[in-house]
């Protein structure tokens, strides 16, 4: 009925992989009422994983007043290769959640972000405002433990030596090109991003109390602070780039 909620149970295949979408949506008449909160509750299952979407959209025709809880959980991200047809750079069990709110498509925020990938945990929030002179991103993230080892290919000692020998045989000893860097991309967006990690693990190095702040505005990129504890010593650095015309 036009005034009744809509139940969904859709099954289909993609790349010979079965997928299923179940749940319910608000009544069809609510789609045309910009003052009515249009509810939706969906579960998408595939390759042993599930994606959950629950909440409402106040004005669905103009996509305004979005308030959705998002979650995804599964045994191995690598299983999604069956759907994409391409191998993913990240493998292992995952559990992801977030809260999407958007007054309009030009201004949205994902808060209460919680990401669990293997032994790594990341929390934070990110917001995008496209009403400014240029798109502005504001993001804050924190990780108690970020284990990069499953995502970084570890080269053997022989391959590293071979690479070093190739560099020695190079005719030029220049580290940087004499040509100016093309920094025009710095004008595309403004951003304020911060990331803190209690511990970051690599194959041959471990960083403690890592902190980085990135501020990009009007083509000027400032990375400050950039601090960490490595091998028992403290490291502090900063970087500033300014995009200019020729």
Language-model features, listed with the residues they occupy:
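Gly/lys/ser-thr-rich phosphate-binding loops in alpha/beta enzymes
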Residues: 113
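Membrane-proximal interfacial segments on either side of biological membranes
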Residues: 1-97, 101-109, 118-224, 229-246
